[in-house]
Every structure is written in C-alpha cells, then in structure tokens.
C-alpha cells in the first residue's frame, strides 16, 4: 500500500535530511491541497508528521491536524510529539484513524502498552527509527534521532507483541531523505520474522523501482514523502505499481 506523507513545521510542509532540524527544506505548498491531491490520485491512507510537536510537545499543531482531517475522506495516520493518553484520545476523536508513537515506546513502554489495551492495536502504530551498526544490530534511536536509544528493534517488537502490536513503521535513519533507495533487506527480514505485523517502510524512496522492491520485500505499506514533493513520480503511478489492498 502507498501511504503519501507530509511533514509539518509551523503549518508549512518541510523535509528534514536524516531527521536534522538544521537541514530543513520548506516547500511552498498548501498542506490541505497537497493531501487532497494525494487522495484524489487514489491514496486511501495519508501520513502526517507534526515536526513542531515532535521537537516541542507544547506547540503541537493539533488545530491544523483537525482541519486537515476534517477535509479529507482518506484514513489519516498522525505522529509527532504525542506524549499522553489524552493526546491520543484527542486525535482519535478528531477522526485520525491511527496514532504514531515513537520515542515514548522506547522510553516508557509500560505507559504505551496501556494505550494499546485502551485504544486497541489498530489505533496505534509504533515508529521505530533504526541505526544499523557494523554488526548488523538494529538499534532504535529516540527523540527525533537527536539521541541514541540503545534498545534493539527486536526487543521492542517482542515486548509490544504481548499487547497485540499490529502496525510498525520502520525507518533506516541512514536512508531517510537521501533518495538512495529503501533498505529492502531490512523489511524482508522483519516481514519473515514477524509476519503478524504490518510493516510500513520508510526512508530513501526515490523511484518506482524502489516502490516495487519494497512491495516485493513483504512490507505492508510504504511511506513516501520527499519523492512525491519533488515530483520523482506521482501517487497515481505509485499505486499502479503497488495497488491498495
């Protein structure tokens, strides 16, 4: 499945290079118009990242997300700076279908597991951003990649499988925003080890060949941001390559 994505800082569409706020590109595009275009081309899921909220949780762009969600029929998945049960409940009440939880799942797993029990495993997607070291270990970074986490991807997946983990978005940090192609070996390995989880691939997508490679890796979906913004290909072409389930 193709999941077009936009990242938002202060209401504007941006891209960060490898998660670095110092390497930011701003696009002169309306978030509403952009998401509407993605929906019109056939996207059934859209992914919104609140980068302002990820950096400063007190400045979460909830009002904008509410407006965007209200204007769209597609399913919306939202991440960035979500720290409390109340925030999860608020987003779901606004019509967001799935909330993405990143750093907090690593730092406070028991808290987040409680949310799985309360809201159900369809309503939560874990975002696991990995640094793969020389030994091939997948170490999950936390806090918007600004600091290392030290837990292995596998240990987190095993832990959250106890509460029915169904959706996980995995980004190879070294590929993100680089347009160098996805780490398909990573998604192939995860899909074969944990077939009960719908893996979302993210990072490095540049061409329709990359989309096809991820499709064939066993991943359930692919998050595409930068490639669409710079017109490497469009959503309709991507869906032709990998139709929605």
From Swiss-Prot:
Pathway: Amino-acid biosynthesis; L-histidine biosynthesis; L-histidine from 5-phospho-alpha-D-ribose 1-diphosphate: step 4/9
GO molecular function: 1-(5-phosphoribosyl)-5-[(5-phosphoribosylamino)methylideneamino]imidazole-4-carboxamide isomerase activity
Record-linked InterPro entries: Aldolase_TIM, His_biosynth, HisA_bact_arch, Isoase_HisA-like, Isoase_HisA-like_bact, RibuloseP-bd_barrel
Stretch forming the signal peptide: none
GO biological process, one term: L-tryptophan biosynthetic process
Keywords on record: Amino-acid biosynthesis, Cytoplasm, Histidine biosynthesis, Isomerase
Subcellular location: Cytoplasm
Source organism superkingdom: Bacteria
Active site (catalytic residues): 7 (proton acceptor), 129 (proton donor)
EC nos: 5.3.1.16
Name of one Pfam family that matches: His_biosynth
GO cellular component terms, A-Z: cytoplasm
Enzyme class, spelled out: isomerase
Catalysed conversion reaction: 1-(5-phospho-beta-D-ribosyl)-5-[(5-phospho-beta-D-ribosylamino)methylideneamino]imidazole-4-carboxamide = 5-[(5-phospho-1-deoxy-D-ribulos-1-ylimino)methylamino]-1-(5-phospho-beta-D-ribosyl)imidazole-4-carboxamide
HAMAP family: HisA
Similarity field: Belongs to the HisA/HisF family.
Protein name: 1-(5-phosphoribosyl)-5-[(5-phosphoribosylamino)methylideneamino] imidazole-4-carboxamide isomerase
Organism the protein comes from: Shewanella sp. (strain ANA-3)
Upper lineage: Bacteria, Pseudomonadati, Pseudomonadota, Gammaproteobacteria, Alteromonadales
Gene that encodes it: hisA
């Amino acid at each position: 499945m193709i999941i077009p994505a936009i990242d938002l800082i202060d209401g504007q569409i941006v891209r960060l290079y490898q998660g670095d706020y110092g390497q930011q590109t701003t696009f002169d595009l309306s978030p509403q118009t952009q998401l509407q275009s993605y929906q019109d081309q056939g996207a059934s899921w859209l992914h919104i990242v609140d980068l302002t909220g990820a950096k400063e949780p007190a400045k979460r762009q909830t009002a904008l997300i509410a407006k965007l969600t209200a204007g769209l029929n597609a399913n919306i998945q939202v991440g960035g700076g979500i720290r409390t049960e109340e925030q999860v409940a608020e987003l779901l009440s606004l019509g967001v279908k799935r909330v993405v939880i990143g750093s907090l799942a690593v730092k406070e797993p028991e808290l987040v597991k409680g949310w799985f029990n309360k809201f159900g495993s369809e309503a939560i997607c874990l975002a696991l951003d990995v640094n793969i070291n020389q030994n091939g270990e997948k170490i999950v970074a936390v806090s918007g990649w600004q600091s290392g986490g030290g837990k292995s991807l596998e240990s987190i997946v095993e832990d959250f499988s106890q509460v029915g983990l169904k959706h996980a978005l995995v980004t190879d940090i070294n590929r993100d925003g680089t347009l160098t192609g996805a780490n398909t070996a990573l998604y192939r390995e995860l899909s074969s080890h944990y077939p009960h989880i719908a893996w979302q691939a993210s990072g490095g997508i540049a061409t329709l060949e990359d989309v096809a490679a991820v499709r064939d890796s066993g991943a359930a979906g692919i998050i595409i941001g930068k490639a669409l913004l710079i017109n490497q290909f469009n959503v309709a072409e991507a869906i032709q390559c990998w139709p929605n389930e």
